């Protein structure tokens, strides 16, 4: 009995051992742990290798996937390099995008038609040497003097639009003995500031003396006997003042550009041949305050042939690097034409400028400047009433007819704008005659030959545009 009980207990203990061994084997098979070096273990700290993608482990330690990834990045140096490389690539992409945007903005600004984004050009030129401008006797003894400029100075290139045009003349005092060489002038008296603003005490300024009126006209024909002119601008200044005088002659350049385009069209076949008009010639006349004719050569320095056709732009003399060289250098007192061009802008903006306006610049503190404030409102209004119906009819006709091409329509628009500018400046075209009679007969009416020429030119445009619909119907 006792032996039977002992045998049963042994069997039970063996069964328990077998079950324990089987359970240990099963647990060892399920475990994926790798052996660790005992040196890595710290007393009181247990380490356990877990699978980061095991949700049970995440829930057990209350961790998120972002936290597991951050732990892996800190522990794995290879993954740390990959993250740094990706951040560098993102930074380089951002820099490249910013540079591309900057380049795109610069290119867009360069090709835009806005005035701020367009390039500006400046030209300057001295008169061309001919018998009238280079003969000292004609300049000092003639009742009027002429200046001829080369077409390369005032003709624009690459569709540049005219911004400003100034005729600069050096005013001399005929009653004062000139100590300097009449052909050269020191750069020290030249100043762009108003002498009245620089003087500390206005009471020291002498009273304004006799005044003279300078008239700049556009010459239409080369021959003296048949020469015709058209007033471009006038300016009033003191008779005793000395220094540079600036007169706006933008209306002259608008007329020259129009005549230049007409001459180019006449060179083409099947074009009507009109009377050739000269371009680039300006006439200067001087009158006193009682309308008596004076000699311009006594008040302005003449040009000479020792000067080239192309002059240094006026703005160059104002630059700081150039001022240091002007201390021992003299500036020529020759008549000059300074022109400023803008980039490709609209036609209307290029010719939309103040009418009959002159900017006078004096270089003597004792010679205050006087603006051009001649009262010609009545004459201007009468000219506008005569010219307004013709321009309105032309615009109405061009708006209802389709032009042959965009370039021709642009040329027609430019011609109309130029005619408006010329009519606003002056429409008094007449034969050369004494100046006293010139102002006595000065009215707002056109010359009969000029009216006939305008009527013929306007009728030719109507015939040209009426042919277009007939051609399309065929």
Curated annotation (Swiss-Prot):
One GO CC term, this protein: extracellular region
Bias kind Basic residues: ranges: 390-400, 437-474
Record has Secreted as a keyword: yes
Region (Disordered): 173-195, 359-474
Signal peptide, first to last residue: 1-33
Localization terms from the record: Secreted
Known glycosylation sites: 54, 62, 73, 116, 144, 342
Purpose: Negatively regulates proliferation of neuronal precursor cells, thereby controlling the timing of postembryonic neurogenesis.
Protein name: Protein anachronism
Gene name for this UniProt entry: ana
